[in-house]
């Protein structure tokens, strides 16, 4: 199973649980966890209140991290369009496209191989939200794409802070 990660900032703090971030790099090198380039750019370019790259952006910018985690597959525009128009809004305005962001790209990579790929996001299902306000799990449900949260991924992949001892 390939786990495709969303770019939310709600993961464990890098300085508090560095083992998690090392494990992500390891799993990326093993081909088990990837972050599509469109999503990777969202958090690798973020700035803090002083205009400096924040801790996550600094981490993501490292060559070792990029090489391990960036998913080097091209998005298929017809799948991105299918997700956008069929999962969010049939005729989106520019403002709606801005609000939707890059989520259709993330979901399209999973749609390409739904048996072997799943989405990992911190977003939770909110079925009452419609249009550009829809959450990733609800759009995934429309297309029968498996979508889990990071805690489910951690359980499925059996992460622990002493993961290196099992190598």
Model feature map: region roles:
Residues 2-117, 125-126:
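Active-site-proximal, substrate-binding regions of enzyme catalytic domains
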Residues 116, 125-167:
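Acidic, PIN/NYN-like endoribonuclease modules and their adjacent C-terminal/linker elements
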């Amino acid at each position: 199973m390939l786990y495709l990660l969303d770019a939310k900032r709600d993961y464990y703090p890098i300085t508090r649980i560095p083992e998690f971030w090392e494990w992500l790099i390891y799993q990326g090198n093993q081909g088990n966890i990837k972050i599509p380039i469109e999503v990777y750019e969202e958090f690798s370019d973020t700035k803090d209140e002083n205009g400096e790259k924040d801790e996550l952006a600094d981490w993501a910018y490292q060559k070792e991290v990029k090489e391990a985690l960036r998913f080097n597959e091209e998005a298929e525009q017809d799948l991105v369009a299918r997700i956008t128009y069929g999962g969010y809004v049939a005729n989106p305005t520019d403002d709606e496209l801005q609000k939707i962001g890059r989520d259709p790209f993330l979901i399209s990579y999973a749609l390409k191989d739904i048996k072997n790929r799943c989405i990992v996001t911190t977003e939770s299902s909110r079925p009452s939200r419609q249009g550009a306000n829809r959450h990733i799990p609800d759009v995934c449900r429309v297309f029968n794409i498996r979508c889990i949260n990071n805690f489910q991924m951690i359980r499925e992949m059996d992460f622990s802070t002493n993961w290196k001892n099992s190598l």
